[in-house]
Amino acid sequence: MNLDQPSTENMKYILDTLAEELQIVNRSIMEVEDYNLDKYEDLKMMYEMVKTKGQLSALEKQAFIQELSSIRK
């Protein structure tokens, strides 16, 4: 999948992957409809950080979740 092109499909993939990696229980905060496509680069950057980092501490997960909530519509 080419994540370089902003699209709703790519954003959904990123959000689903982040939800799994961050072990988010309440998946309703990860609905693609709740994010503007103009925030795609922010989401992609977070996705790349999480994938690169691998294992995240509880504090790091919480920080990512807070960042996600700040860029929601």
UniProtKB/Swiss-Prot annotation:
<dbReference type="Pfam" id="PF06569">
    <property type="entry name" value="DUF1128"/>
</dbReference>
<protein>
    <recommendedName>
        <fullName>UPF0435 protein OB1527</fullName>
    </recommendedName>
</protein>
<comment type="similarity">
    <text>Belongs to the UPF0435 family.</text>
</comment>
<dbReference type="InterPro" id="IPR009507">
    <property type="entry name" value="UPF0435"/>
</dbReference>
